[in-house]
Design a protein with these regions (language model features):
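Short, intrinsically disordered, charge-balanced linker/junction segments flanking boundaries
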Residues: 1, 6, 147-155
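Basic, helix-initiating cap at the start of DNA-binding domains
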Residues: 1-27, 31-43, 57-60
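Amphipathic alpha-helical segments enriched in hydrophobic/aromatic and basic residues
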Residues: 24, 33-34, 45, 55, ...
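Short coil/turn segments at alpha/beta junctions that flank glycine-rich nucleotide-binding fingerprints
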Residues: 26-30, 81, 103, 151
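Hydrophobic alpha-helical connector segments
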Residues: 61, 75-108
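Amphipathic alpha-helical packing segments from all-alpha helical-bundle domains
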Residues: 68-71, 75, 83, 87-91, ...
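Amphipathic alpha-helical segments used for helix-helix packing
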Residues: 88, 102-128
């Protein structure tokens, strides 16, 4: 058995995620098998299982990788004091949209999440995660709109 360095393991993991992202975008999540991903990444299915417990975990890791820049952008905005809640809401939306527009990976993963994911049992954790993310985003928007109303900026 060949021992791999941390860098080689990280590169293998990234190539698996890259292959999954491309195939999910092309074929949809439910029609893409782990064997398809392994072949496209030039690895064995065993290598996939070394990094990811199942297809759902692989899907979640792909989502995490693409949403990290968005989460970081919103977190930076959270560190600033809120002067105008409507401007904060606009800034958050613009930060996320700017990443989707300029980052091909984020754009492709957003497309996969919204158009190419059939929520089956194998990616049920992704369905739950998506629902939680939507609820969190809605909560943020509601809080900012409520603050704007209380300040008289909105009727």
């Amino acid at each position: 058995m060949v021992r791999r360095t941390k860098e080689e393991a990280a590169a293998t993991r990234d190539s698996i995620l890259d292959a999954a992202e491309i195939l999910f975008a092309k074929q949809g999540v439910s029609r893409t098998t782990l064997q398809h991903i392994a072949s496209a990444a030039g690895v064995t299915r065993g290598a996939i299982y070394w990094h990811f417990v199942d297809k759902g975990a692989l899907y979640s890791a792909m989502m995490d990788r693409a949403t990290m820049p968005m989460d970081a952008a919103v977190k930076l905005l959270d560190e600033r004091p809120v002067v105008d809640p409507l401007q904060r809401l606009r800034d958050e939306m613009m930060a996320v949209l700017q990443i989707v527009v300029t980052d091909a990976t984020a754009r492709r993963v957003f497309e996969i999440a919204t158009l190419k994911t059939e929520f089956t049992d194998e990616v049920d954790s992704a369905r739950i995660r998506k629902r939680e993310a939507v609820c969190e985003w809605r909560g943020r928007m509601e809080a900012q709109l409520a603050q704007a109303q209380s300040e008289g900026t909105l009727p």
